[in-house]
Curated annotation (Swiss-Prot):
A zinc finger (UBP-type) spans 187-295. Zn(2+) binds at residues 211, 214, 231, 244. SUPFAM superfamilies: Cysteine proteinases, RING/U-box, UBA-like. This is Ubiquitin carboxyl-terminal hydrolase 13. Residues 652-693, 727-767 form the UBA domain. Disulfide bonds: none annotated. Its EC number is 3.4.19.12. The UBP-type zinc finger has lost its ability to bind ubiquitin and USP13 is not activated by unanchored ubiquitin. The UBA domains mediate binding to ubiquitin. SMART domains: UBA, ZnF_UBP. Keywords: Autophagy, Cytoplasm, Hydrolase, Isopeptide bond, Metal-binding, Phosphoprotein, Protease, Repeat, Thiol protease, Ubl conjugation, Ubl conjugation pathway, Zinc, Zinc-finger. Deubiquitinase that mediates deubiquitination of target proteins such as BECN1, MITF, SKP2 and USP10 and is involved in various processes such as autophagy, endoplasmic reticulum-associated degradation (ERAD), cell cycle progression or DNA damage response. Component of a regulatory loop that controls autophagy and p53/TP53 levels: mediates deubiquitination of BECN1, a key regulator of autophagy, leading to stabilize the PIK3C3/VPS34-containing complexes. Alternatively, forms with NEDD4 a deubiquitination complex, which subsequently stabilizes VPS34 to promote autophagy. It comes from Bos taurus.
Amino acid sequence: MQRRGALFGMPGGSGSRKMAAGDIGELLVPHMPTIRVPRSGDRVYKNECAFSYDSPNSEGGLYVCMNTFLAFGREHVERHFRKTGQSVYMHLKRHVREKVRGASGGALPKRRNSKMFLDLDTDDDLNSDDYEYEDEAKLVIFPDHYEIALPNIEELPALVTIACDAVLSSKSPYRKQDPDTWENELPVSKYANNLTQLDNGVRIPPSGWKCARCDLRENLWLNLTDGSVLCGKWFFDSSGGNGHALEHYRDTGYPLAVKLGTITPDGADVYSFQEEEAVLDPHLAKHLAHFGIDMLHMHGTENGLQDNDIKPRVSEWEVIQETGTKLKPMYGPGYTGLKNLGNSCYLSSVMQAIFSIPEFQRAYVGNLPRIFDYSPLDPTQDFNTQMTKLGHGLLSGQYSKPPVKSELIEQVMKEEHKPQQNGISPRMFKAFVSKSHPEFSSNRQQDAQEFFLHLVNLVERNRIGSENPSDVFRFLVEERIQCCQTRKVRYTERVDYLMQLPVAMEAATNKDELIAYELTRREAESNRRPLPELVRAKIPFSACLQAFSEPENVDDFWSSALQAKSAGVKTSRFASFPEYLVVQIKKFTFGLDWVPKKFDVSVDMPDLLDINHLRARGLQPGEEELPDISPPIVIPDDSKDRLMTQLIDPSDIDESSVMQLAEMGFPLEACRKAVYFTGNMGAEVAFNWIVVHMEEPDFAEPLTMPGYGGAASAGASVFGATGLDNQPPEETVAIITSMGFHRNQAIQALRATNSNLERALDWIFSHPEFEEDSDFVIEMENNANANIVSEAKPEGPRVKDGSGMYELFAFISHMGTSTMSGHYVCHIKKEGRWVIYNDHKVCASERPPKDLGYMYFYRRIPS
């Protein structure tokens, strides 16, 4: 055993002294209660630091806590020691040495390396014929940094030896992430083999889906028992849905649903409501065929098109990746690549673009000491810690260094030299941000746009105090709907984070070339001749912008003026312009045969973008607003009884749901109220309540019981319901709105019944045709908006409005036929030049293909 201060740059590192077995045992006695043997289910981190991308390959090695089994690099192990008092760590180090050369100058014959025992990936950039690995393990005792070499059966207590062996033999908590093996991590649903499917004649079209209970047209799930199409859960950015798919399961007990838009020949995203997780359905093709979706035909069709499709799209791959061009590798801060974990390029491209934005750099990397110091005991399960870790890894330059002796090698090898690319592996980050998500937890390719919105949700949910970097993307969209029959209008606003531009194929400027190409291609196919060179449709950006601003028909529009369904027309404008504008070109669609298709187009995206002409103007002179009346509510006969049973006694609050919400960072009392007012329906439903009410002044106030039945009048004085303004108690309003009724309905019903909850519910059921008091509603909304503004003052405006003039600074491109396949790369303009980020490879771009992008990132030009 030796005391090695040299590990930490301390003197005396070369000295060592042998100690008797009794001395080692005596040294470990105070720490024995803290040394654990890993149990089944314990995650043992041996490959990567929780705060950095240090590994056993790093210069300082890796320290594994023998109690928590978390790993830390040399720079961060002291922080964990100070925070937890854990003193015993296993130090792991892998040495890479050049093999001894033979007399002829070549390497000696390759021998089995008996000194490799760590479960680590080898460096693909090192020739195994020239280099060999040697792994080293030691116990280190803090704070004096005593070292005990391993193995040491003779001197170590039996418990310590068992614990060390268990740590060394444990597998990584992250399985080998490739498309084939990751899929096996999803369990097969126990309902798949004997799933009941109703013979109700339902057939699902390949497009035009809409939730059966609301007007949402995204995040839709097909129930595999009865063919119902319903929306998923709600997210911060107003995407997601109203949770009707889950409600349908609770009403019917039909357990399995598949997400529309994810169905490919290789599978789809299937969720089991009963099992509460993403699952595999081995009979998915049969279950989908029941509703007219023929996956086997899709597979045959894709294979039939494969030979014809791949060749034309080779040029797309070559152009976007700048194949055939000698690209200069880039190193240093901001030029770090991300290794591909197996179809993780969508994540890598989005994160490279995100951390090129100063607001995200400041929020995370700028707050690194504070975030790391106040991280939870398990930092691998904390979003802000992992975002900061990733941001530091990308921006520090610590993991993007030129290869050793690169200048000398380049002189000797010239153009034959292949530069070494370091890069970092986002395995821990991906595992955290994708957990419990049916799409991103798989290792199939995903849509970069969907991941961008998912990331924004997480940033919103885990914002650091008053700082919310995703504010730079947020903007307000004004939607104007006009009743075609009465010509009256309604103006509403919603929050969004990106601008979706349709592809105006009819505006292609090379139609004659496209027609000639299509004729030649078909002739070549029929005669089995080589296909002609691809002709790509050239679409003016102005045409896409025009298509975005044109009116669109609204299906199933309910006119409050007619109090009936009518034809409606909707136009969208910007009520505010964001600091950073994200533009998505909607290149993907489905054919009538359910095969995902991609518009292979070239859009002349501008470097400078002016959208000031799309600024919303609100109600115009001469326009008459539609009455503010909600459509009548159709309620099943048993709904009242079922809803009343949701009211629970405070002593029966589900504390497990409360703790789940509290672990997300919400105030404990707010979590208790959320679970209570949603009738113990679970953490997910309670989370939605929190989102709706988190801006209210009494959000974190303790739970106080509203009145029930005859006790309502007694409770009214507590909540101020009998005040001069007849304001209903907010808690009672929350109970009714949590049942699915509109807030305005709840207020009107409570005012009409002196805030008696039971009578208010009776009033709602007996007055489905009631008209809301518009003046009161407007006053309430103004008060709510005033509260939001006053709450937002410390953190700045929630919407960063300004000029609509922008300049392009990044874009993400997709290669392939579908978002569920292919590859993503990112181009970012840094220091006046374009740089391509292609997984772990970072190079100066010679010809950035700005016309072939999928997502574009613009920053506002200061006026």
